[in-house]
Amino acid sequence: MSYDLMVFEPEAAPKNHDAFMGWYFTLTKWNDGPYDDPARTSARLHAWVREMQRTFPDMNSPEAEIHLKDDEGVLGDYTIGRQFIYAGFAWSKAVAAAGEAERLAKLHGVGLFDVSSDREEVWLPVNGTLELAHQKRARFFKRLSRLLRGR
């Protein structure tokens, strides 16, 4: 199991949580490959992955074997789409990977989805920082909302 996250073009993503999750599940059916070429994505996402790979090299790159000798947990697995990049990391590097992904998302103005979070947090760039745009609502609040609407 890995720690997973996704960065994406904010303009491409739906703004409400349910629609976003539908978009995410459509993207992760992996029907629009190949997914190993950074040139096929946007300039902002390309810049993000290029910098992310300085800290967490691509496990599918020719240089991966060199990094395996030092610390196999340092490698990242990158799936590169036109409007998103899905990235997986060793759980032992989750905090470091999340921190670097967030820093670079702010720098490059891309959205960030914490795939491994129980709350399904989606962050969008706003004036050089990231703000929580939406997340999964707790079951209690979903039930309360339905009751209040008479369902």
Each language-model region and where it sits:
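Acidic (Asp/Glu-rich) sequence patches and key acidic residues
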Residues: 1-151
